């Protein structure tokens, strides 16, 4: 019997997509499900960006673009990095892809050889370890619990480094926790990395603009780190453009050239119309970005305050993104009389089936004691969801 490759067989399916699918199935049955499992803004793409896309269609931007993306888009990204982040790049140091997910995967693929180790702080985005495994590398997971705000320390980083370490994947603001590394915390990690000059940092900054503490901090801005850091970013979260699929890397030219070589053999350049929309996003008014950020901050305050009232939940105060990641292991071993809650995935399924609230268990994020809730939804949905969760958990003894 013909079988799929061992490489594919080793991959785990996406837990976030699986929960979203299960939620959709219940909704199709007419059940009122509040979906807190979705990792995308609930806002619409700003009108001026949509108008730019319409114009691109009328102007016949319908052919292949350069593999790395149109020069106009890459120049707009160069200007964004200089004006917003104080970082100097050239267009040759930018490569655009079909979303930031592909940008991360591209970078992993061009850096990692079989047996190489990639350090991944946990909790992590579910796809990071799978990308490393796809490249036949070894994910080295460094756990950071809620007591340290889900952020690793310099000592933990130092202890994880071996002669096989090729890269560190660092996500700030974080999916799934919403934690944000301060400038001082990044400097501490950088001091460790400077002792190991061959390690590349893959800095996933896709949630840069959904930030509640002020200026975004990039590890690339620290002296000595820019030439060994690959910034990953894109338009999906900040501009409510998840379906447009435009991400990018900014980094050393030798890595960018390798990424272009790889991408040229399996997807080529990203969608031409989406690129023109992304160009408009970066060069146009940033007021919609700030309006969405303010709405997310208000929702963050609401869900944190409500979740603190749920017995057995331990809650931090996320400083970015749009996720809450409460510790819920208090409920492990409890039962409603028909089922036993053994782990976070059991709890997430219980909440979906009983409370009709979709969350994602933390096991796939490297944190089996937590569940992820997205507050990229209305204030009314947030309030009702936490009420349902509280009522459902009260039935567990």
What are these regions (language model features)?
Residues 2-4, 8, 12-14, 19, ...:
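PLP-dependent class I/II
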Residues 24, 78, 82, 108-109:
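Generic structural signal for well-ordered alpha-helical scaffold segments
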Residues 37-40, 55-73:
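A glycine-/small-polar-enriched, mobile loop at the entrance of the PLP active site in fold-type I
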Residues 45-64, 78, 83:
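Glycine-rich phosphate-binding segment of PLP-dependent enzymes
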Residues 64-97:
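Conserved N-terminal alpha-helix of the aminotransferase class I/II PLP-enzyme fold
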